[in-house]
Regions:
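Charged phosphate-binding loop/patch that engages nucleotide di/tri-phosphates or the phosphate backbone
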Residues: 2-23, 170-195
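Acidic-basic catalytic patches of nuclease active cores, encompassing PD-(D/E)XK
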Residues: 17-78
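Positively charged, polar, low-complexity stretches
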Residues: 52, 67-70, 78-81, 88, ...
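Short, solvent-exposed loop/turn segments at secondary-structure junctions
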Residues: 64-66, 105-108, 142
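Conserved catalytic cores of phosphodiester-cleaving nucleases, focusing on short active-site segments
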Residues: 85-106
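Mg2+/Mn2+-dependent nuclease catalytic core
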Residues: 101-128
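Nucleic-acid nuclease catalytic cores
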Residues: 123-153
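Short, electropositive alpha-helical surface patch
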Residues: 147-169
Length: 195
């Protein structure tokens, strides 16, 4: 079974249609990204259960505005502040912080998916000796790449590009093996690139 076969299987649920009044054939972009993150979360659980590392999904702090006390449910809330990156943790004594991005485009990841407050945070992680990278899922190609933040940010700043090309990511990133367990084995790439 190849990487493409495995990712196609994982992304199969991403092709479900979201019905709305304007376009009943539109694909839910939020669900597509959440499925990718769910696969990362499952991989992280496996890593933790096997005592390989401790990497967790970071939650974005919210301020509760209204709550239904009978059902013990939040009915209205706002984000307190911007989030930093999606995941953080420790592997072999080194701090890790990374962001996960998914695109349905075959040739690029739009730059508007990379937020400046996250870039600032990830640069600080690097400045203090941590490991910072992006996991980029080209779901149409059934390929996931790990790309180091320093390499990515230098490219963005030097080219003034509006998107990050697939060719750049393929050339400068590292293909992540897809398996049954762990689903997205990015830890193997981290061992090769950073240790």
């Amino acid at each position: 079974v190849t990487n493409k076969d495995l990712l196609a299987l994982f992304n199969k649920k991403n092709t479900r249609k979201k019905r709305n009044s304007d376009n009943p054939q539109s694909i839910s972009r939020a669900n597509r990204g959440m499925d990718f993150e769910n696969d990362i979360n499952i991989s992280n659980d496996w890593y933790r259960e096997n005592n390989l590392c401790s990497i967790l999904k970071r939650t974005t702090p919210i301020k509760v505005l209204k709550m239904d006390s009978k059902e013990k449910r939040i009915t209205s809330a706002v984000f307190e502040k911007q989030s930093t990156a999606d995941y953080n943790g420790v592997f072999r004594g080194r701090y890790i912080d990374f962001e996960a991005k998914s695109t349905m485009l075959k040739s690029s990841l739009p730059l508007d998916k990379i937020k400046m407050h996250q870039v600032k945070h990830l640069k600080e992680v690097i400045k203090h000796g941590g490991i910072a990278f992006y996991l980029i899922n080209f779901s149409v190609r059934s390929e996931i790449y790990l790309i180091d933040c320093t390499c990515l940010f230098n490219h963005i700043e030097s080219t003034q590009c509006k998107s990050i090309s697939y060719d750049f990511v393929k050339t400068n990133g590292h293909l992540v093996n897809l398996k049954y367990v762990p689903r997205i084995d990015y830890l193997e790439v981290i061992k090769t690139v950073y240790f």
